[in-house]
Regions:
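Extracellular loop-to-transmembrane helix junctions
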Residues: 31-50, 108-138, 148, 191-203, ...
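Membrane-interface helix-loop-helix modules in multi-pass membrane proteins
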Residues: 22-28, 33, 79-142, 153-157, ...
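Membrane-interface "cap" regions at the ends of multi-pass membrane proteins
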Residues: 1-15, 47-101, 284, 324, ...
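Transmembrane helix-loop junctions in multi-pass membrane proteins
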Residues: 18-31, 100-102, 114, 172-188, ...
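Loop-to-transmembrane helix boundary motifs in multi-pass membrane proteins
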Residues: 154-172, 364-373, 439-441, 459-470, ...
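Membrane-interface loop-to-helix entry segments
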Residues: 35-43, 47, 53-60, 166, ...
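Extracellular/periplasmic helix-exit of transmembrane alpha-helices
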Residues: 298-314, 369-448, 484, 529-534
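Flexible loop linkers connecting adjacent transmembrane helices
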Residues: 53-81, 107, 117, 121, ...
Length: 692
């Protein structure tokens, strides 16, 4: 009877999801409620976790709860610490969920809500969550090694060194981009800075509480942490309103850069149980709580999707970003569907904290589904805004114009209704002087969230509050990826340096830790600082590579997963990784080729550089440059980006080729050839999941 009722529940979930998808598909140009997207997404996630992740766990990788994990085996109180699965879920989710799921879907909305929705859902089920889960499994079975070191073990020394260099370079770009977004969000924002700063002492208290004061009392410390977090958010508004207090928490971009660099260094060196894990767990309360609250708000308000299902910009002529739907939609959405950055966390901090191998499914697959839900919420928030306002916020000023009248005229010509009064009223409602050309996706997400939440709590008078709350939410959301990413980067760099000097590979060595951390922080910190002081320098030079390099890293991780399955003699299930690997290789290599060699200056770095050079030769200055000197800087940036794109293509192709060779060898072998650490049974005591 219980089994029958269980099947009936899942049949009901499937039918509800099918009905939601049918409602979306049969809209025929009519506006529909955003709640159907939310319902469809939740049904997909529930079914995928219950059935597909269970299939992978039991058949493909065959998780073993009696096998000792690296956290239990090497429990050193620093990097290897058996951690309660709910705390670890919070840490892992906070670490992987950065800017991508917030910003990518917002930018993808220029093509309509349908393409983005379909890729976010299909991508996470069959690619993103699969990658995170399988890489976590592989690393856990190999003493928690980093991605590059895993490639070196399973594919060979040459591809391993290539992967180590390539992955670390991509990691530096990703961390610098994420850090720049945090700096921009917190500059001259005492409310946001105070609240983010307050999470540090709260996390330290939580770490000490669960390790020494009340070990294992996760429920207690969760309640305490949540109350303190809410108090810090509420008091942050008082800090903002007080001239005396605001002065203590108001920093320039340069000051915040140095603070962030210092924090990243400290967070990477301190024991993981003391700051990083509890702070990420704490941040997850706000992250998941806000997203769930937004979902409930959508169910209550049932706002209309004002963006069309498909816009005319699917042809690649969009003003927000250039490029055809294939392959650039998949590159733009990035982390909401699949992210290479996640593989660095799944092979970095998380496998060193996993208390039982069976929890890899909940943490690896489950946390990625949660991040995808964040992406769906971001897409919905962007699509409930009037399309005219959306394009006015996200298109560059050089295309739009600078006055409300000019912007309204330009956007109206694109086929979207917009008046100057709509722009001024929206800016006034959210407490901004202007919303024109607020590119990057984050302000648009904040406006969309405010439009939904103010209808649930507070009315029009609370519009500005919810807007600024959303900006704070985004900053805290992204910062957790910076500190965890720095620690993962330290592990990667130690593996890389250990290739040449084995002593530097020892994670328990303080000198090795300090050296690798200093080098990692210096790498992303340099690009961050230069990007803050120079709008055309530092990470601003490499920003266009963020999406494509991230997806290329995912392709490398999935190649590794495919090779390991063949070497484990699980080739009958290898389609689980082969399909997403092939798709990502096709997408990323096509996008990389077009970014280098396409003839369209709006797409190709080289074509854009040639266009600017021709204009400069005639003495003309083209936007966004304001002088011939700036034109030369942009031309230089284009050549740097083209060279790095070509380098990343070579890295991905070489890893793919070595992967094919490894698969052929594995098929010829009679016995499994994967290089797992020898099996050791889990100790009988102490009890697992103690929360330490």
């Amino acid at each position: 009877m219980n089994r029958a009722s269980g099947y009936l529940v899942w049949i009901a979930v499937a039918l509800l999801g099918a009905f939601a998808f049918g409602t979306i598909a049969l809209a025929h140009g009519e506006r529909i409620s955003a709640l159907w997207i939310v319902i469809a997404a939740v049904c997909v996630y529930l079914i995928a976790y219950r059935f597909y992740s269970r299939f992978i766990a039991s058949k493909v990788v065959q998780l073993d709860g009696l096998r000792m994990t690296p956290a239990v085996k090497y429990n050193d109180g620093l990097d290897y610490v058996p951690t309660n699965k709910y705390v670890l879920f919070g840490h892992h989710f906070a670490a992987i969920a950065g800017a991508g799921p917030l910003v990518g879907p917002v930018l993808a909305a220029q093509m309509g809500y349908t393409p983005g929705m379909l890729w976010i859902l299909a991508g996470v089920v069959f690619a993103g969550a699969v990658q995170d889960f399988i890489v976590l499994f592989i690393s856990t079975r190999r003493d928690g090694r980093s991605l590059g070191d895993l490639v070196k073990m399973e594919l060979g020394t040459v591809p391993g060194v290539i992967a180590l260099f390539g992955a670390f370079l991509i990691m530096v770009i990703i961390l610098a981009v994420l850090a720049l977004i945090v700096v921009k969000a917190l500059t001259n924002s005492p409310w946001g800075t105070f609240t983010v700063a307050a999470t540090i002492p709260i996390a330290l208290f939580m770490g000490v509480y669960t390790r020494y004061i009340r070990p294992g009392r996760i429920g207690e410390v969760s309640i305490i942490g949540f109350v303190l977090l809410m108090a810090s958010i509420a008091y942050g508004q008082h800090v903002h309103d007080s001239a005396a207090l605001a002065a203590w928490f108001t920093f320039s971009g340069t000051q915040l850069t140095w603070i962030l660099i210092g924090y990243g260094f400290v967070a990477s060196v301190l024991p993981v149980w003391l700051l990083l894990a509890p702070r990420d767990y704490l941040s997850t309360f706000l992250k998941i709580g806000t997203i769930v609250g937004l979902a409930i708000g959508i169910l209550i308000v049932a706002p209309e999707l004002k963006m069309p299902a498909l816009t005319k910009f699917v042809d690649g002529t969009g003003p927000v970003w250039s490029g055809n739907l294939f392959p650039f939609l998949f590159i733009t959405i990035a982390c909401g569907a699949v992210s290479g950055f996640h593989s660095l966390i799944s092979s970095g901090t998380t496998p060193k904290l996993l208390d039982n191998e069976t929890n890899a499914r909940f943490i690896g697959y489950g946390a990625m589904l949660m991040e995808s839900f964040v992406a769906i919420m971001a897409l919905v928030a962007a699509c409930v805004i009037e399309p005219g306002v959306y394009f006015a916020m996200n298109a560059p000023a050089a295309v739009l114009g600078t006055t409300p009248e000019a912007v309204a005229h330009t956007v109206t010509q694109w086929g979207f209704m917009l008046t100057p009064d709509m722009l001024t009223q929206m800016a006034k409602a959210v407490g901004e002087t202007t919303i024109i050309a607020r590119a990057g996706g984050a302000p648009t997400l904040a406006v969309g969230m405010a439009q939904i939440l103010h209808q649930v709590i507070g009315g029009e008078a609370m519009m500005a509050f919810w807007y600024h709350f959303a900006i704070l939410f985004e900053a805290l959301f992204i910062l957790t990826a910076v500190d965890a990413g720095t620690r993962a980067g330290r592990f990667m760099l130690q593996d890389l340096l250990g290739t040449f000097h084995p002593a530097l590979k020892r994670t328990e060595s303080l000198p090795a830790n300090l050296t690798a951390t200093a080098l990692c922080v210096a790498a992303w910190g340099y690009f961050l600082y230069q990007g803050v002081v120079d709008p055309l320098g530092g990470i601003n030079t490499l920003w266009p590579l963020f999406g494509i390099s991230n997806q290329m890293l995912a392709a490398i991780a999935l190649v590794l997963g495919t090779v390991v399955l063949f070497k484990m003699k699980r080739e009958r299930y290898a389609w689980v990784t082969i399909v997403p690997t092939a798709w990502l290789l096709i997408c990323t290599l096509t996008a990389g080729w077009q970014k280098v060699f396409d003839s369209n200056p709006k797409v190709s770095f080289l074509a854009h550089a040639a266009k600017l050079q021709a204009a400069a030769a005639d003495g003309k200055v083209l936007a966004p440059a304001k002088s011939l000197a700036q034109m030369q800087r942009i031309i230089f940036n284009d050549y740097v980006d083209a060279a790095l794109s070509a380098l990343f293509i070579l890295v991905v192709v070489s890893i793919a080729v070595y992967g094919v060779v490894a698969v052929v060898r594995a098929r010829r072998a009679v016995q499994p050839t994967s290089r797992e650490t020898p099996y050791e049974p889990m100790p009988v005591a102490p009890a697992l999941g103690s929360g330490r």
